[in-house]
Amino acid sequence: AVCQKLEGMYELGVRSFAIFFDDIWGEGAKADKQAGLLNYVTDNFVRKHPDVMPLIMCPTQYNKAWSGGDYLSTLGTRMYPEVRVMWTGNSVVDMIERDDMEWINQQLGRKAFIWLNYPVNDYCQSRMLMGKTYGNGLDINEMVSGFCSNPMEYAEASKVSLYSRADYTWNMPAYDATSSWNQAIAAL
């Protein structure tokens, strides 16, 4: 059923796919079950379409505060190495530094795919997060397999942060939060 749904999206032109296991419990939250499903999808869908990007997954334990046992290492050893694993850092909403990447990459046996929960504001709905984007390590570019931001439900208001996030990922070592924010305001 999963591959059928992905096939329908493929026919519409989608070439990048993600399967999310965040915020679930029970049998579906077990690393071996998740790895098995992702390997199945890779074998029976992704590899049948050479133009499809590697599969991305969000684990149930997507931050260090919620990690425990051998969940992450089980994903890393049982799941195909090309599957990218999302990671939010030490907590749900956090900035990510070099030592954070070293820890998670060792757990997974691969480079993590950063999922920055910013500028999403579902945890502070009375505020719009449009300030400078800062706090992530400027020396982690070689340690990540990808990077995405979780925007607010307000698309236009999210653009300031997303502009800076794109600037950051384009050239991490040279990123300057104040300059990027000023450029975003001028451009948008």
Task: List each model region and its residues.
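Short, conserved phosphate-binding/catalytic loop or strand-edge motifs used
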Residues: R15, F21-D23
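Catalytic domains of carbohydrate-active enzymes that cleave complex glycans
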Residues: A177-L188
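Chitinase-like catalytic core of GlcNAc-active glycosidases
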Residues: A1-R15
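Catalytic-core regions of glycoside hydrolase
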Residues: K5, I24-T178
